[in-house]
Amino acid sequence: DDDLVRMAFNAHQRRDKGLGAALGPEAAPALAMRLVQRGFEVHLARSPWRLKLAEPAHAPLARALIDGWRDAASAQQPDARARIAAWHARRIAGCGPDRAPGGGTLEVGHVDLFAVRAAACAC
């Protein structure tokens, strides 16, 4: 059910937030392209967030992310609410030092973007 939740969450990210359809996971590459068109030098780098589920400092954020994914996926796919709730229960059970002996890792895809105005041509 990870794929169901991921697809529903990504679709939810792309919903209109009042300014037209949002870009969701495509936001960083789209911004990079527009910045390059406007004369910027752009660097993109993958920088996934890696949360250790057994780590007390990471577990609250992991739980909040999983809760948010559940909420967004359920809003996007109301007919799959029961399936998403079961997914949530399985995933949330792995968070915290008392529930994840030896740990596990939650990885959230993320992209950093750095842009600087390209130097003027000295031709």
Language-model features and meaning:
Residues 28, 62, 66, 107-108, ...:
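Short runs of predominantly hydrophobic/aromatic residues within well-ordered alpha helices
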Residues 43-99:
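C-terminal helical/coil "lid" or tail adjacent to the Rossmann-like core of SAM-dependent
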Residues 100-105:
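Short proline/glycine-enriched turn/loop segments at secondary-structure junctions
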Residues 6, 12, 43, 58, ...:
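Histidine (H) residue identity feature
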Residues 108-123:
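Core SAM-dependent methyltransferase catalytic element
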Residues 1-46:
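Conserved catalytic/acceptor-binding region of the Class I
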